[in-house]
Amino acid sequence: MLQPKRTKYRKQMKGRNRGLALRGSKISFGEFGLKAVERGRLTARQIEAARRAMTRHIKRGGKIWIRVFPDKPITQKPLEVRQGKGKGSVEYWVAQIQPGKVLFEMEGVSKELAMEAFDLAKAKLPFKVMFEERTVM
């Protein structure tokens, strides 16, 4: 599971997920990519589930890049605990995703195989994504 090795602060404020992805919006490593259409949170478990689905489908034929990293800690209080007494402990890590962000990239496989693999990954993600091909300028 992906998570930071160490952070300056253990807990973060909730914040807001606004705007469009300007950085990381172009395919820069592989030939094909999976791009977010909606905004949302992507947990480390969801990233791992999508990666496994793609890797199993391409049978280790091509190469996959994960372009997102879960660097935001999400805290939760235990069940049946009254409010107050401080912020809860860190339960999991998320990556905040804006529309236009490239999540995964792939190369070394045919377009059909890449589309099938990305379709399997799509089912593991909590928001709409689209398949994109690298454009050569």
UniProtKB/Swiss-Prot annotation:
| InterPro entries per UniProt | Ribosomal_uL16, Ribosomal_uL16_bact-type, Ribosomal_uL16_CS, Ribosomal_uL16_dom, Ribosomal_uL16_sf
Coiled-coil boundaries: none
The entry lists its GO molecular-function terms as: rRNA binding; structural constituent of ribosome; tRNA binding
A GO cellular component annotated for this chain's UniProt record is: cytosolic large ribosomal subunit
Which keywords does UniProt give here? Ribonucleoprotein, Ribosomal protein, RNA-binding, rRNA-binding, tRNA-binding
Spell out the SUPFAM superfamilies in the cross-references.
Ribosomal protein L16p/L10e (SSF54686)
What Gene3D superfamilies is this protein classified in?
Ribosomal protein L10e/L16 (3.90.1170.10)
Please list the GO biological process terms of this entry.
translation
In terms of PROSITE patterns, this protein maps to:
RIBOSOMAL_L16_1
Per the UniProt record, one Pfam family is: Ribosomal_L16
Which CDD domains does this entry report, sorted A to Z?
Ribosomal_L16_L10e (cd01433)
**The keyword Cytoplasm belongs to this UniProt entry's keyword annotation:** no
Which cysteines link up through disulfide bonds? Answer: none
Q: List, alphabetically, the NCBIfam families matched.
A: rplP_bact (TIGR01164)
Binding partners and assembly: Part of the 50S ribosomal subunit.
Which PANTHER family does the UniProt entry name for this protein?
A: 50S/60S RIBOSOMAL PROTEIN L16, LARGE RIBOSOMAL SUBUNIT PROTEIN UL16M
Task: Outline what the protein does.
Answer: Binds 23S rRNA and is also seen to make contacts with the A and possibly P site tRNAs.
**Which family is this sequence assigned to?**
Belongs to the universal ribosomal protein uL16 family.
- Which named protein is this? Large ribosomal subunit protein uL16
From which lineage does this chain's organism come? Bacteria, Pseudomonadati, Pseudomonadota, Gammaproteobacteria, Legionellales
**Encoded by which gene?**
rplP
